[in-house]
């Protein structure tokens, strides 16, 4: 039962990344401050060419989290192999656009950090016993 709950959380977190892609390619208001620059330069926004590249990376994080959830439900042990890169990419796309992303994405960054810490330390074995 616990693996279904974890898979649902991972799936939901993954799907939430679609908003980063949408914000990079459309003017639709979905909570992002698309006019604000990223933290390194005032010339780069989420809708600049580099910002659009980051939007594609948001989709990669979506794919990683969603696939990890599916593999977990299928009871395969290698779901964490997908999860760690997905969390890393997610964190790497949120941090540069910290001024741009909505509060939910900032919370998601802390979730990504939690995932990276748990699944790259001995805590991984403890969680593996639960699922």
Residue ranges and their predicted role:
Residues 1-131:
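Membrane-interface extramembranous regions
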């Amino acid at each position: 039962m616990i693996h279904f709950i974890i898979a649902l959380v991972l799936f939901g977190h993954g799907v939430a990344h679609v908003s980063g892609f949408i914000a990079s390619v459309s003017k639709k208001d979905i909570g992002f401050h698309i006019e604000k620059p990223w933290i390194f330069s005032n010339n780069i926004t989420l809708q600049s060419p580099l910002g659009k590249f980051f939007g594609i990376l948001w989709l990669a994080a979506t794919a990683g989290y969603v696939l990890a959830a599916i593999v977990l439900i299928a009871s395969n042990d290698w779901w964490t192999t997908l999860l760690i890169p997905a969390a890393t990419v997610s964190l790497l796309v949120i941090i540069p656009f910290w001024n741009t992303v909505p509060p939910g994405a900032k919370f998601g960054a802390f979730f990504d950090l939690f995932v990276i810490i748990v699944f790259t330390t001995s805590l991984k074995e403890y969680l593996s016993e639960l699922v």
